[in-house]
Amino acid sequence: MKSLFLIAFTSIALSQSPVPAGAQLEKLATGFQQPEGPVWKDGAGLLFSDIARSTIYLWSPVDSSTSVYLHPSDSSNGLTFDRQGRLILTQMLKRRVSRQVIDGSITPLVSTYNGKQFNCPNDVVVRSDGSIFFTDPDFNIPAGQQSQLHFQGIYRLSPTGTLQLLDSTFDKPNGICFSPDEKKLYVNDSHKCIIYVWDVINDSTLANKTVLYTIPAMGYADGMKTDEDGTIYCTGPTGVWILSPSGVYLDKIAMPETPSNCNWGDADRRTLYITAGSSIYRIRMTTTGVRTSGFRKSGFYELRENYPDPCDPGTMIKFHLPTECDVPLCVFDGIGREVTTLVSGTLPTGDYSRHWDTSEVSSGVYFYRLSTGSYVIARKLIVLK
């Protein structure tokens, strides 16, 4: 059952705070052991890890249900998507970073540095060029196993599979995220509650490491995200700490359970989803979050999620094309039969919307699919009458 909590502001009413006045923190689900790594899957809902149960769950915004998405997940922690929409996950039990391919199987991407096994890859982010950045602290190394590395690193895995050590000076590197323009990288040193920032040079090199902010509370910093304004959201002691791009404290979302991570969700990316304690929460914000699906720049194809209005006999399906191409956009019913073709022809670069009149179909689950040669993606759509 969902619960609502009034947010108690911990600062004076700062005008820069992205938390709206009177905002309510909503508990969506509870009873998990170690929820982590939330990420929004367009057309489906919120994916999140339960490390202790070695399971990835899916929370659905349609009926607020929670179902098993992947089990066993080898104690997955951080989750994100690459630019092809494939799930990227850190697997603590296997001490590696992996990818889930279209058929649902798991493909290991990297598990060693210079022939030595990683400590325990924790959090992960994908840059819009396809490179994967991740942290590798030594907590949660599986029982009976030892650390083979004498440092705890921050790494970059290039789109061609080349692994690069970016930093080896942290005590416990944990949360990791980019600024909206990807010119800054943020990583926190978890047990010290220090957030650092670098300049990203030539897409792959870090420079000018600087302390951005030190959380003034006992505990540890965990997962982090940014919004479109560059504001940083760091889960940590007693709540989600909100900082300006220059490291000025703006506000804190006070939490009834200790938060472990957060991410943006819903079609407009204006809801912050938070894993905390044994539960999942959300809160609506005044700002829009940075997508974690590899589509942050306009150079990629995108088929956007859709939530039909039951009071409207039609619905809009939106998509983006980075280049001119032949585009079939079709709708299928739940057993794969084609219902209608919305687009069939060549379109130039740009953003598009196509209307589908649902008055002639019954309530149920449908799928809309965009095909552009090598790029094919489908989204689920639910018609309610």
What residue spans do the PLM features occupy?
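A short helix->beta-strand "capping" segment at the edge of beta-propeller domains
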Residues: 16-32, 209
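Beta-rich, blade/repeat-based domains predominating
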Residues: 24, 30-45, 72-91, 95-96, ...
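C-terminal outer-membrane/trafficking sorting elements
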Residues: 296-385
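A short loop-to-beta-strand structural motif that recurs across blades of beta-propeller domains
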Residues: 55-57, 96-98, 152-155, 194-196, ...
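A detector of repeated loop/turn-to-beta-strand junctions in beta-rich toroidal repeat architectures
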Residues: 53, 94, 148-152, 192, ...
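Beta-propeller domains
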Residues: 46-67
